[in-house]
Regions:
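Active-site-proximal structural scaffolding
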Residues: 266, 305-306, 408, 488, ...
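Phosphate/pyrophosphate-binding active-site segments
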Residues: 2, 6, 170-173, 211, ...
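Thiamine diphosphate
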Residues: 136-150, 347-348, 356, 363-364, ...
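N-terminal alpha/beta PP-like core and its mobile active-site loop of ThDP/TPP-dependent enzymes
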Residues: 2-374, 378, 414, 418-421, ...
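Short alpha-helical "patches" and their helix-cap loops
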Residues: 35-36, 378-381, 478-483
Length: 635
């Protein structure tokens, strides 16, 4: 469209201008364009129904020329809608996301947890919490929190610490720079996360004469920062000097779409590749250099190599405490680090040699600079032996024949066998992410979707919705524990409403398996971690399940097909039925609360009470003092 077409102004409300602007925003990388904000989630109340709600309706039934559709989906919970948007963004490798709107007060505050999840995971979401009247004439309005010390602060200021960009629109003119900066942050690979623009309910509906040029198509180019020559030379020198280098591949490798380059680099150099939760699948599990998960929930192969490594090459990792085993994983006293990361904040961790660059660009440059380099034969043989030994343990965990209830690892083994290379498995919290990181044999970077930065119970059900919207061609399988289910089940209704075909696997063990085991190991005797009916004495001694609680029936009441099974063979048959169905299906299976889980080889720092009258806690504290001795800063 010519520049002349954008001369003059158009009179729109702030909300209408927001939707029209967002409908024409695009992201681009490697020559491929995407609609940056292809749709909207929203729950309406008096704070947004006549503002953004009206604007979305108008976009749907009376759009103007040059205004793209902004399809609206009605969710059931404000936190859930943000989780769905985050999962959508993660599945698109951060090239797209959804906008989310909520009403004033409790509706908007419900989005804070989702915002924190997105920012912690470095994935973009765009949030529009509604706010109190900017004019302050109706004051206090319904659902407004009053602060007697200032009239400036509202509950939406809670979004500030969990957002990568926060603004409040008190005048229409402020919208223009605010939205432009919002798009900048959403598409910045180093700065992305939750972007929050609070909108007072009166300002949303206020009319203004907007420059037409504001609504032209804009393409936001997602950058691939090249490697600085001097930084490359320093990294190459470190690698050449190392005898036992180990790559730790994080989510940044996948978001950069650098999997092919990682495989080629590993093949050329022989350097083994361990993965984090976010990075699993960046290298296929059957690659000769793939050594699986590393850290507190990693496997023996990755952890044994990490124990002795003299150089850690971190690619796109934020080094969470699970990756470093709370700073006990890398035991070589002379270990050094080279960190390749698009964010200097992450590249600087562990006193590393910093390579602030895109993962793909850096791997290409390193491969060229190390063309004549390969680890020695003895190290290659050790890598192969570790891989073989751990593969045998994985196979055992997948085929335990445990009874009377199956172990959840057997369910994971069945799923690992049944899922296709482009299908997606989703999880976030409890004992399952630990088992999955240790055991899951990821074939592609698409397949493994575990949110373990914020590890938010309740993520799994809405995340399946978001992932399926992003990849309708993939089978999306979300593994849900009964603890997570009871936190946030209501987006099952949204899935049924939208006719979204996903598969939920509900593992019911009547408690918190992960925290129960952690509680026991820290001397707290699984207190408050089992779903049991209170008896006449201590509920810890009462093993009776709560009568009348039926999660399978509850899921069916949301409009989901439910198949109840009790054995692994029945589970496989049920999965095949769910796979060919055109409706969302939940497969319900009871599993053993007490495992068994994969063998662990690394520690996690969870502090134990330093003084106690309980013998179990006293013993746990002695173990804790012993186990934390290897902790150190990497300087």
């Amino acid at each position: 469209m010519s520049n002349e077409a954008y001369t003059g102004t158009v009179r729109l409300t702030v909300a209408q201008a927001t939707i029209r602007f967002l409908s024409n925003q695009y992201s681009e990388r490697d020559g491929v364009e995407h609609r940056l904000i292809p749709g909207a989630f929203g729950i309406f109340g008096h704070g947004n129904v006549a503002g953004i709600g009206q604007a979305l309706l108008q976009n749907e039934i009376a759009p103007v020329e040059g205004e793209n559709p902004m399809p609206y989906i009605m969710p059931r919970n404000e936190q859930g809608q943000v989780h769905a948007a985050a999962a959508f963004a993660k599945t698109t490798n951060r090239m797209q996301t959804y906008m989310c709107t909520a009403s004033i007060g409790p509706g908007s505050l419900n989005m804070v947890v989702g915002a924190a999840l997105a920012t912690t995971n470095r994935v973009p979401v765009l949030l529009f919490p509604s706010d109190q009247f900017a004019t302050r004439i109706p004051d206090p309005v319904l659902q407004q929190l009053e602060d007697p010390t200032t009239l400036e602060v509202t509950v939406n200021d809670c979004f500030r610490p969990v957002s990568r960009f926060f603004d409040r629109i008190n005048r229409p003119e402020q919208l223009i720079p605010s939205l432009l900066n919002a798009m900048r942050v959403l598409t910045d690979p180093a700065e992305t996360g939750a972007v929050t623009i609070a909108m007072p309910q009166d300002v949303q509906a206020e009319a203004f004469d907007w420059p037409l040029e504001f609504f032209r198509k804009r393409v936001w180019h997602v950058r691939r920062p090249a490697v600085e020559k001097a930084a490359l030379e320093r990294a190459v020198a470190k690698i050449r000097a190392a005898k036992r280098p180990l790559i730790i591949s994080g989510g940044g490798t996948i978001y950069s779409e650098a999997s092919e380059q990682l495989r080629e680099f590993a093949s050329a150099t022989g350097i083994p590749v361990a993965d984090t939760q976010a990075g699993k699948g960046a290298i296929n599990y059957d690659h000769p250099c793939s050594v699986g998960g590393v850290g507190s929930t990693g496997g023996d192969s990755g952890n044994h190599l990490a124990d002795k490594a003299d150089l850690i090459i971190g690619i796109g990792t934020r080094y969470s405490d699970f990756t470093t085993a709370s700073k006990t994983q890398f035991k070589n006293p002379d270990v050094q680090f080279v960190n390749i990361n698009v964010a200097a904040f992450d590249a600087a961790k562990q006193s590393a040699e910093m390579v602030v660059a895109d993962a793909r660009e850096a791997l290409v440059a390193l491969k060229e600079a190390l063309a004549d380099y390969h680890v020695d034969a003895a190290y290659s043989e050790e890598i192969a032996a570790e891989r073989e030994a751990w593969a045998a343990k994985v196979d055992k965990c997948y085929h335990l024949g445990h009874g009377p209830l199956p172990a959840q690892t057997e369910v994971f083994g069945a799923l690992n066998e049944l899922l296709g290379e482009e299908d997606i498995v989703i999880n976030a919290a409890g004992s399952m992410p630990g088992d999955l990181q240790a055991l899951w044999q990821a074939k592609t970077p698409v397949q493994y979707h575990v949110e373990y930065a914020f590890s938010c119970m309740g993520y799994e059900i809405p995340a399946a919705l978001g992932a399926k919207l992003a990849r309708p061609q993939s089978e999306v399988v979300s593994i849900v524990g009964d603890g997570t289910y009871q936190m946030l089940p209501m987006e099952l209704a949204t899935v049924a409403q939208e006719g979204i075909k996903v598969i939920y696997v509900l593992l019911q063990n009547y408690g918190f398996a992960s925290i129960g085991a952690l509680s026991e190991s820290r001397g707290s005797q699984r207190f408050g971690t089992k779903y049991r009916k209170r008896g006449t004495g201590s509920h810890l001694e009462d093993e009776q399940n709560i009568p009348g609680v039926d999660i399978a029936a509850n899921a069916a009441s949301w409009g989901i097909d439910v198949i109840k099974v009790s054995t692994i063979e029945e589970f496989k048959d049920a999965y095949r039925k769910a796979e060919v169905s055109d409706k969302a299906t939940m497969i319900h299976i009871e599993t053993d609360l007490y495992g068994p889980n994969p063998p662990g080889s690394s520690w996690w720092d969870v502090a134990v009470s330093g003084v106690s009258r309980l013998e179990s806690t006293q013993k746990a504290y002695e173990d804790y003092v012993r186990d934390r001795k290897p902790q150190r800063h990497y300087l």
